[in-house]
UniProtKB/Swiss-Prot annotation:
Protein name, entry field: UPF0354 protein BALH_4267
InterPro entries according to UniProt: DUF1444
Family from the record: Belongs to the UPF0354 family.
Pfam family, one: DUF1444
Length: 270
């Protein structure tokens, strides 16, 4: 049979078919590109050159090119993952539990309103870890959780501060994608607890903000409720409009509206 660039493209695509790789064919330049779906890194194969080799070596030429492409892409993937970090991310409990049907994300319960997911972050790409990715990484769920919490503790923090009606509010907003993640840093929470004189209230309205408040009066509770609702509405990745009282390592959701309603009802009765 006569081999053409189009036929060679079809042969190589059959040999290199993998769910994590994509193909792009430029018919004008007669170039087939094979790339990783996640990182978009890949290899360009000039098909006329492969056809010329096929004229001499037949099937062996196709095998050699396929082997070269496969090894190069696998090496790229390993290099990328070797520099990648696993970090926890906070999401709402309404966030999807599966990447797709039959492929659940790796998750850990956090509060009544929030859940912990895990991200593989290589600076350029960011992907939530699901069971299939977990297998590719060759890690257990427990290893992922331990690595993620360790890396979360290494995230820096510098709060901006504001005081209203005697209540002090501390804001963390670095926009690194992991501001809400700092809620998992127990030593950070303990150090803030030591400097707070009233109730310690914590909020993660969206991915890119962590609010810690020193609440000393009812006005403070009203302010944190309004503030959290505003941030929640504005966030690209909203998490929860509720804030939490932090005490002895536990987070208790504050149902501000119910609290205010009871207060109002009491005044009306009196």
């Amino acid at each position: 049979m006569k081999m053409t660039s189009k036929k060679m493209k079809d042969e190589l695509m059959k040999k290199l078919s993998r769910p994590e790789w994509d193909f792009q064919y430029d018919s004008e330049k007669e170039v087939l590109r094979i790339e990783q779906k996640d990182s978009k890194k890949g290899i360009n194969v000039s098909l006329p050159g492969v056809v010329a080799k096929w004229e001499v070596n037949k099937e062996k030429a196709i095998e050699e090119v396929a082997y070269y492409v496969q090894e190069a892409l696998i090496a790229m993937h390993k290099e990328e993952n070797s520099t990648a970090k696993i970090l926890p991310v906070i999401r709402s409990t309404s966030f999807p539990k599966q990447a797709e049907e039959g492929n659940p994300f790796i998750m850990t319960d956090h509060t009544a309103e929030t859940r912990i997911y895990y991200a593989l972050d290589s600076n350029k790409t960011y992907r939530l870890i699901d069971e299939r990715l977990l297998q590719k990484l060759g890690l257990t769920e427990q290893q992922v959780r331990e690595m993620a919490l360790f890396n979360a503790r290494s995230l820096g923090y510098e709060f901006k501060q504001d005081t209203v009606a005697g209540n002090t509010f501390y804001f963390l907003n670095t926009n690194d994608g992991y501001d809400a993640t700092r809620i998992l840093n127990e030593s950070l929470l303990q150090s803030m607890r030591e400097k707070i004189s009233g109730d310690m209230v914590v909020a993660v309205p969206h991915q890119d903000v962590l609010i810690i408040a020193d609440i000393v009066n009812e006005i403070g509770y009203d302010i944190i409720a309004q503030m959290t609702m505003k941030f929640f509405a504005e966030g690209h990745v909203p998490i929860t409009s509720l804030s939490f009282v932090y005490e002895d390592g536990d987070f208790e959701p504050i149902f501000i509206l119910a609290k205010n309603r009871k207060k109002t009802d009491g005044k009306e009765k009196g």
